[in-house]
Curated annotation (Swiss-Prot):
GO CC, any one term: cytoplasm
Family: Belongs to the TRAFAC class translation factor GTPase superfamily. Classic translation factor GTPase family. EF-G/EF-2 subfamily.
Record protein name field: Elongation factor G 1
The keyword Ubl conjugation appears for this protein: no
Residue intervals of the tr-type G domain: 6-284
CDD domains, A to Z: EF-G, EFG_III, EFG_mtEFG1_IV, EFG_mtEFG_C, mtEFG1_II_like
Function as written in the Swiss-Prot or TrEMBL entry: Catalyzes the GTP-dependent ribosomal translocation step during translation elongation. During this step, the ribosome changes from the pre-translocational (PRE) to the post-translocational (POST) state as the newly formed A-site-bound peptidyl-tRNA and P-site-bound deacylated tRNA move to the P and E sites, respectively. Catalyzes the coordinated movement of the two tRNA molecules, the mRNA and conformational changes in the ribosome.
Pfam families named in the record: EFG_C, EFG_III, EFG_IV, GTP_EFTU, GTP_EFTU_D2
Originating gene: fusA1
Compartment annotation: Cytoplasm
Gene Ontology MF terms: GTP binding; GTPase activity; translation elongation factor activity
Organism: Syntrophus aciditrophicus (strain SB)
Length: 695
């Protein structure tokens, strides 16, 4: 590592699925001499792209995990995170953006700005990541870079500026015109590695001149010297324009747009120049941490290597070498053998082996300096943990983790599969905070939860392949709850005589609805009607009853229990007896308290082109959705609704066909609400059927 922070670029390559993002990364690695042969994502040679190192990724031709790699271009060091383009893997994109300083937004010259481009762009805005855009696939039929630039302006609100013009398009795409140097650039040689510069073709000269004037006019806002040169009519140097473009990009006020075809090896080297010229180095970006000892007051971090170390673990991987933790150092130096503190649990950790990653190969290093990305071994932690020098109680702002929206049961075929499956689930839940798992107490089935059907499909497939576990999956199910709607009294005696000492306990009091908490227990016993040592047993008995409601066996929520009287026996009373008495008392009062079923209501936000607004609202209304609001955003509109989760299964397929695949939606848990009577009756019937078949 050179350790000159000005020469470091931490970038991500983000895009819509199939925009050619992994192919672009592959070409970058080839031109920067990190690899010596190029392979295509779905190539005939069957090797697959370098960055897609997971077997499943190579087969499906999609990127699932964001592999981190580094390369050098000129005297700059570039760390690249290759991120997935599927909406189901957004946690990977979120994590990558948290640790990047800049990004390349890859767009397809034919498809333009697509639904996932909007999601990725929103994520970049959330983390304030400056970016340059690359319009890929200019060799494809229907390629139209000018239209993509317009869409960047209208659909994403970017001040997009064309930095290049294409020389020919579709099958005739030969090279580019650089609008700053006013030279035509062609890419010769077997892999496009030989650059040839010539004069701008006559036919393109008028357009190139007017586009260059537009460019200079737009970026002059960011440079006084450029504005002066324009006003005084003096010569405008290339350096002046570049500095102005860099300033505008860092402020996120402009997005420079480059064009090319990664597959045809055209336009990659100028894009690499743009990364080093216009995207920020770690010192250009302001990073802050939260001071946990001062009520999370923000603390500005510096890129100074003399300061105490602060680093963020942003990705965990269980590889052939054991657990690998990807880490970005924001301040100070993380050295081998150093002791740091994990802000989440306050535990001290000694740093072992440090490495620098290239897809799934590695090289050992002694230290990671501020601004750099590396990986380390043998560190027990979770994704998103902050490590800081002793005496610093700092945490990097927590990464936004969306709630899972879909769940299904997964059943192993035999004992061996069960052992392997639990190993797999243990690993995946640690690596991916949006993938969760729990045991259904009713059916004893393992339930997995995630961000969408593809997300869970991939994990089920990985359990089968990587862990050799034969598993089957069930249908998705909704997590209903129960609650009470009125106050009801209880006075219950538990008495059991079985030779020797028996069991005896009486509890009296009432239960009532509680709106802001799941459960509250209040002891109003006076005069020792129940001895103090048995009160915790009473509370435990009531708590246990809440796990499974007497009516439908769903978990019970929103109940306050008050005990104000009771009785005990000097010999026969015990913890066990009072737990049993509390359970009986709860059953007795529960049915008198008019119990009802609650269902999870989701906040559903749909982004759709305006022409489909009516159709989308109709779909939501059919699903018992309540439209909360709509927002007009030019060509598209955003519809927000509150919809029961039970009605949302299969919605992605329906909305795709209703909007020609142009709408996208997000869904997150909002609240539990009472189920309408007609639906409650259906649920009751289903539960009765299930109980009957189980019996």
């Amino acid at each position: 590592m050179k350790n000159d922070i000005k020469k470091v670029r931490n970038i991500g390559i983000s895009a819509h699925i199939d925009s050619g993002k992994t192919t672009l990364t592959e070409r970058i690695l080839f031109y920067t001499k990190r690899i010596h042969a190029m392979h295509d994502v779905k190539g005939k040679d069957g090797v697959g792209a370098t960055m897609d190192s997971m077997e499943l990724e190579r087969e499906r031709g999609i990127t699932i995990s964001s592999a981190a790699t580094f390369c050098t271009w000129g005297d700059h060091e570039v760390n690249i995170i290759d991120t997935p383009g599927h909406v189901d893997f957004t946690i990977e994109v979120e994590r990558a953006l948290r640790v990047l300083d800049g990004a390349i937004l890859v767009l397809c010259a034919v498809g333009g700005v697509q639904s996932q481009s909007i999601t990725v762009d929103a994520q970049m805005k959330r983390y304030k990541v400056p970016c340059v855009a690359f319009v890929n696939k200019c060799d494809r039929s229907g390629a139209n870079p000018a239209r993509v630039v317009e869409q960047l302006k209208t659909r994403l609100g970017h001040n997009a500026l064309l930095m290049q013009l294409p020389i020919g398009l579709e099958a005739d795409f030969q090279g580019i015109v650089d609008l700053i140097s006013m030279k035509a650039v062609y890419f010769d040689g077997a892999g496009g590695e030989l650059l040839r510069t010539e004069a701008v073709p006559e036919s393109l000269l008028p357009e190139a001149i007017s586009r260059r004037e537009e460019l200079i006019d737009s970026v002059s806002l960011f440079s006084d010297s450029l504005t002066e040169a324009i006003l005084e009519g003096t010569e405008i140097s290339e350096v002046m324009i570049m500095e102005a473009v860099r300033q505008g990009t860092l402020e996120r006020k402009i997005t420079p747009v480059f064009i090319g075809s990664a597959y045809k090896n055209k336009g990659i080297q100028p894009l690499l120049d743009a990364v080093t010229r216009y995207l920020p180095c770690p010192a250009d970006i302001e990073n802050s941490a939260l001071d946990l000892s001062r009520e999370e007051a923000p603390v500005q971090l510096t890129s100074n290597t003399e300061d105490p170390v602060v680093a963020l673990a942003f990705k965990l991987e269980d590889g052939i070498y054991g657990q690998l933790t990807y880490i970005r150092v924001y301040q100070g130096i993380l050295s081998r053998g150093a002791t740091v503190v994990n802000a989440r649990d306050g535990k001290k950790v000694r740093i072992g082996r440090l490495v620098r990653m290239h897809a799934d190969q590695m090289e050992d290093i002694e230290a990671i300096h501020a601004g750099y990305i590396g990986a380390l071994f043998g560190l027990e932690c979770q994704s998103g943990d902050t490590f800081a020098a002793q005496g610093l109680n700092l945490a990097m702002t927590s990464m936004f983790v969306p709630e899972p929206v879909i769940s299904l049961a997964i059943v192993p075929k035999d004992k061996k599969s069960m052992v392997n499956m639990s190993k797999a689930l243990n690993r995946f839940t640690k690596e991916d905070p949006t993938f969760r798992t729990h045991l259904d107490p009713e059916t004893s089935e393992t339930i997995i939860e995630g961000m969408g059907e593809l997300h869970l499909d991939i994990y089920v497939e990985r359990i089968r392949r990587e862990y050799n576990a034969e598993v089957t999956t069930g249908n998705p199910r909704v997590a209903y709850r129960e609650t009470i709607t009125q106050k009801a009294a209880f006075n219950y005696t538990h008495r059991k005589q079985t030779g020797g000492s028996g069991q005896y306990g009486r509890v009296a009091g009432y239960i009532e609805p509680l709106s802001d908490e799941d459960f509250l227990f209040e002891n109003k016993i006076t005069g020792g009607a129940i001895p103090t040592q048995f009160i915790p047993a009473c509370e435990k008995g009531f708590r246990m009853s809440m796990a499974k409601g007497p009516k439908m066996e769903f978990p019970v929520t929103g109940v306050k229990v008050v005990i104000d009287d009771g009785a005990f026996h000097a010999v026969d009373s015990s913890d066990m007896a009072f737990q049993a008495a509390a359970r009986g008392a709860f059953r007795e009062a529960y049915n008198k308290a008019k119990p009802v079923i609650l269902e999870p209501i989701m906040k559903v936000v749909v982004e759709t082109p305006n022409e489909f607004q009516g159709a989308v609202m109709g779909l939501l209304n059919q699903r018992r959705g309540m439209i909360v609001g709509t927002q007009d955003e030019g060509q598209t509109c955003v519809i927000e609704a509150q919809t029961p989760l039970a009605e949302m299964f299969g919605f992605s397929t329906v909305i795709r066909s209703a909007t020609q695949g142009k709408a996208q939606f997000t869904m997150e848990f909002s609240a539990y609400r009472q189920v309408p009577q007609s639906i409650a009756e259906k649920i009751t019937e289903e539960v009765a059927k299930r109980k009957k078949s189980a019996a």
